[in-house]
A protein has these predicted regions:
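Single conserved hydrophobic/aromatic residue that forms the stacking wall/gate
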Residues: 1-12, 16
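Family-specific signature for flavin-dependent thymidylate synthase
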Residues: 24-28, 37-173
């Protein structure tokens, strides 16, 4: 499976990792990350956001490791998954392995369907169902996309997700 294993071995190093994904059809996506801190005063912030459709599955397994000599570490891990239909399935397994008390570490995980109140709000203002769902997905992913430093990449990602969501409508008709 795809793995991400940054090693924080220099004092005062900072890493911000962002990732988005979209699963459809019967895809199985397996993500594994390791944030390994072995030096003092390091910082890591990991944010995964995914959208699942059809019978796609995702599993995220993440581990923050903080060595005994890594005092002053700040490490954060977040995984959020948005299910577009009931047949999609997601599992998230965040873990902490901390050997030093002088740290700030946390992990968070959610798997949720499209918020029906958000959809209703948009539809009650004349937004068609499909467009409402696209807006919700784009809003969900915006935290990651807006943090990317290259505007052309942001535009490309938005176009890619628009294409995938448009294919979803064509497939369901």
């Amino acid at each position: 499976p795809p793995r991400s294993t940054p090693l924080y071995s220099s004092a005062a190093s900072d890493v911000y990792k962002r990732q988005i994904y979209h699963g459809d059809s019967n895809q199985v996506l397996d993500f594994r990350t390791l944030q390994r801190h072995i030096a003092r005063d390091t910082y890591s912030e990991l944010l995964f956001k995914g959208v699942l459709d059809d019978q796609s599955n995702s599993i995220y397994t993440g581990l923050i490791q903080v060595a005994n000599e890594a005092s002053g570490t700040n490490a954060f891990q977040t995984n959020r998954t948005l299910k577009l239909c009931d047949q999609a399935w997601a599992e998230s397994v965040p873990n902490l392995e901390i050997e030093n008390n002088d740290v700030k570490c946390s992990h968070a995980s959610t798997v949720s369907p499209v918020d029906e109140n958000q959809r209703f709000y948009l539809e009650s203002r004349g937004v068609p169902t499909f467009e409402a769902e696209k807006l919700i997905v784009h809003g969900f992913l915006q935290e990651v996309v807006s943090s990317l430093p290259v505007e052309a990449i942001n535009i490309w990602i938005a176009e890619l997700f628009n294409h995938k969501l448009s294919a979803r409508v064509a497939h369901s008709e």
